[in-house]
Structures are given as structure tokens and as C-alpha cells.
A protein has these predicted regions:
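Glycine-rich, acidic/polar active-site loops that bind/position phosphate-bearing ligands
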Residues: 1-446
Length: 446
């Protein structure tokens, strides 16, 4: 038994914790949870807790359903939205096969494999995500979506519900050892953003799953609804999950070069080139729903075209401003992902794409200095700028032919995502929308 496991057993006994929740996700990124009694902890650490994997989306087939949950004791935290009188704790889990091998379909395991591949190449990856979401007043229905305020970007709303909400959410996140860089009101009414500090990729994905759950829990307790839907309003900005990435070789930031353009190293340029080369192929993972493409093609600074730029928020990849004496903070920002993505899979394909650029020494295309949305199709063509997929169907088609995504996800996850996303697109394509009825449901003129 390691020191983390011993710590968990002591904490559970000293604080009289009666319920321990074991968390993991399905392939779609939906959080799953099973509660165990403290008496089961030692067995869980030693052997894992059995469950029916075939009942969880994408994990396994019905004829090989037995799987194990192995708690990661380093993720042990109390749930701050639960009563102190009846404390509840949680740990994230790795999913194992009955013989103890990592389950190939476990999203957390997919990311762990890519992180190991980066480490084998000499790199330590750090990820800093921005999480955007809308706060709506209850009750919420498709016909009734009322934002909690009418504020805009960076607005301070005196005694505003968003201010109070963010303050409570940030305090709870930090109580769970999830470091927050900053929080603020975003561009849409009732839209907020909480930025988490850079940590290793697996912890970053764990933190996103925790943050989404915590934000939803805090909202419900305040008689609000938090939605991470990429584009809930036609007339307002969509919600993204801009993802900042950096690589370290030892203690040195591999993206930093004092002599490079924008202080960006050759390694950093190759990493960006890899992201751009595979952007269309990975879109079905970073932007996994039909609604995701209404954000990407709906304006509001969402990226629609495959290019990079310095400080250019119309670009897919942005190189943020370099601050003097801040070499360790050198990073790139990939702006396509949205908060409905499975963060484990999204981070896995982003890292894999960037590493491919480094391994193949890809050349980076010229920088896009203009607002890409204002350029004509001809101008973009001359600059070598092509579009991201316009729909989930286009994204799945691009992913289907991707050797990189197939190798990164593994056969089982890859095949499941293709099937599941095709099903989602087919169901959407068969819908008759209100707009169609309003436009076409009329008596044919005589």
C-alpha cells in the first residue's frame, strides 16, 4: 500500500467519512459514479471494484462485461457541496480488465498512454483550460432560457448573481485542491468563465470533470441551471474550452526560444504545425456534438479556419503575448474545443497531433495576421487556409480516415466514437425544426 492510500484510510477514519464515490467517465465524457463503504477501501486499492462495463457507453461489449475500477488515491478529496456533518469523498479511477490490465476503452487510460508517449520522447506536458458556461434561471425548458443577467465581457455587476456564483464556485474548487487562475463574466448574458491553472494532462482532465460537476451542483443549490452546451443561443457567443498547452524538457520550457519569432522555439512551431495538420481529423473529438459546429461557425470569436496567429483571436491556434522574464509561461492556445468534450480524449488527440508535428519536423505555415473571417474565400485559398469541418458529419468523415486518431484512441474507442457520432448526426438530420415549420408550414397559394 502506497503513501497516498495510507493517507486516504487515515482521513476516512478520522473524519468519519461514510461514503466514498468512485468516479470515471464513459467514452462520451459523461461522469459515472459508484459509492462504496469505507470497509471496501483496502480491497478497492488492492484488487479494484467490479462493475458491469457493458452498461457504460463505449467501455466494452456485453459478452466481456466484467471490469474493475481501481481508485487513484492521489485524487482523494472531500466534496465541498456536501454537508460537513455527513462528509462524502471522491476519487477518480482507472478502468481495468479482469486480469488487471488497463482497459483499452478507458478514456483516462487513453490519455495516460499519450502522456507516457510524450514522456518517452523527453517531454512533460502541461495544460491550462478555460471553461465557459451559461447560468440560466429556473425553470429551464427549450422554450424558456433566461440568462441570470444581461452583462457582457468583464462586466462587474453590483450584487450580481454571477459574481456571487463564481466566488462560491472558485472557493469550492480551491477547497478541492484545484487551482484557479482567474474567473470573470464572458461576452454573453449570463455567460461566465473559470480558468484553471496549468497542471499535467490527466490531472487537468480530472479537474475539468470535477469543475463541471461542481458548477452544476452549486447552480442547482442557488436555483439556477449551468449549461456547458456549446451554442445555446443563436444571438449570443458560444461557450468554448480554449486549451493552453506547453511542453517541458526537464525544467526548461521547450516552446520558448529567446531568438524565435514571438519567442517561440522550433519545437513550438512544429507542435503547432502538427495541430494544424490534424485539425480536421480531431474535430469530432474536440467538438463532439451537432451543436458544437453551430458554435464554430456562429461567430463570437470561435475559430472556423485552420491557421495560427500571434494575438489573433480569429485563428485556430494562438501564440499568447510573451511577458519578459516569463519563459516558463510560454505556451500555445488551441481555441476549437468546447466544454461538452470528453477532456481525456480531447487532450489525448491534441497532444498526439502536436507530437506528430515534432516527430515529422513539420514546417509551420505563414502566420495569419488579418481577421480570417473578413477574408474572401479566394484570399484564404491563396494563404493556404482551409476550413474546419462545417458539421459533425464532416468531422466524422475526416476522423474516419485518420491514422493518427485511430492509433491514439485505440480500435475500440475509435470505432465506438464513429458509430455514436454517426447515430447522433442521423437523429439530428431526421428532425423537423421549428424554423422549418415557421418558414414552410403554410397554405400553398391558389
Amino acid at each position: 500500500m502506497d503513501s497516498h492510500q495510507e493517507y486516504v484510510l487515515r482521513e476516512v477514519a478520522q473524519k468519519n467519512i461514510r461514503f466514498i464515490r468512485l468516479w470515471f467517465t464513459d467514452v462520451a465524457g459523461v461522469l459515472k459514479s459508484i459509492s462504496i463503504d469505507p470497509g471496501e477501501l483496502e480491497e478497492a486499492f488492492a484488487e479494484g471494484i467490479g462493475f458491469d462495463g457493458s452498461a457504460v457507453e463505449g467501455l466494452t461489449r456485453v459478452y466481456e462485461s466484467d471490469m474493475l475500477l481501481k481508485p487513484d488515491a492521489s485524487t482523494f478529496q472531500l466534496l465541498p457541496w456536501r454537508s460537513n456533518e455527513d462528509p462524502v469523498a471522491r476519487m477518480f479511477c482507472d478502468v481495468l480488465m479482469p486480469d488487471g490490465r488497463p482497459a483499452p476503452s478507458d478514456p483516462r487510460g487513453v490519455l495516460e498512454r499519450v502522456v507516457k508517449r510524450a514522456a518517452d520522447a523527453g517531454f512533460r506536458v502541461m495544460i491550462h483550460p478555460e471553461i465557459e458556461f451559461y447560468l440560466l434561471r429556473q425553470p429551464v425548458t427549450p422554450d424558456r432560457m433566461i440568462p441570470v443577467d444581461q452583462a457582457g465581457y468583464f462586466d462587474h455587476v453590483a450584487r450580481g448573481d454571477s459574481n456571487d456564483f463564481r466566488r462560491r464556485a472558485v472557493r469550492m474548487l480551491e477547497d478541492m485542491a484545484i487551482p484557479v487562475e482567474f474567473s470573470h463574466h464572458e461576452g454573453g448574458p449570463g455567460q461566465n468563465e473559470i480558468d484553471l491553472r496549468a497542471v499535467d494532462p490527466v490531472r487537468a482532465a480530472d479537474n475539468i470533470m470535477t469543475a463541471r460537476t461542481l458548477i452544476e451542483e452549486v447552480a442547482l443549490r442557488e436555483e439556477l441551471v449551468a449549461t456547458f452546451m456549446p451554442k445555446p443561443f443563436i444571438e449570443h457567443p458560444g461557450s468554448g474550452m480554449h486549451t493552453h498547452l506547453s511542453l517541458f524538457e526537464g525544467e526548461e520550457n521547450a516552446f520558448f526560444s529567446p531568438a524565435g519569432q514571438y519567442r517561440l522555439s522550433t519545437t513550438g512551431r512544429q507542435f503547432i504545425a502538427g495541430l494544424l495538420a490534424h485539425a480536421e481529423e480531431i474535430a469530432a473529438i474536440t467538438n463532439q456534438h451537432v451543436n458544437s459546429y453551430k458554435r464554430l461557425w456562429g461567430g463570437g470569436e470561435a475559430p472556423s479556419y485552420v491557421c495560427w496567429g500571434h494575438l489573433n483571436r480569429s485563428a485556430l491556434v494562438r501564440v499568447p503575448l510573451y511577458k519578459p522574464k516569463k519563459a516558463a509561461a510560454a505556451r500555445i492556445e488551441y481555441r476549437a474545443p468546447d466544454p461538452s468534450a470528453n477532456p481525456y480524449l480531447a487532450f489525448a488527440v491534441l497532444i498526439a497531433a502536436g507530437l506528430d508535428g515534432i516527430e515529422k519536423k513539420m514546417e509551420l505555415m505563414p502566420e495569419a495576421e488579418d481577421n480570417v473571417w473578413d477574408l474572401s474565400d479566394r484570399e484564404r485559398q491563396v494563404m493556404g487556409i482551409h476550413a474546419l469541418p462545417a458539421s459533425l458529419s464532416d468531422a466524422v468523415r475526416a476522423m474516419k480516415s485518420s491514422d493518427l486518431v485511430a492509433a491514439t484512441l485505440g480500435e475500440q474507442v475509435f470505432d465506438y466514437v464513429i458509430r455514436n457520432k454517426r447515430k447522433e448526426w442521423t437523429e439530428y438530420r431526421h428532425q423537423i425544426t421549428r424554423q422549418e415549420l415557421e418558414q414552410f408550414l403554410k397554405v400553398v397559394p391558389r
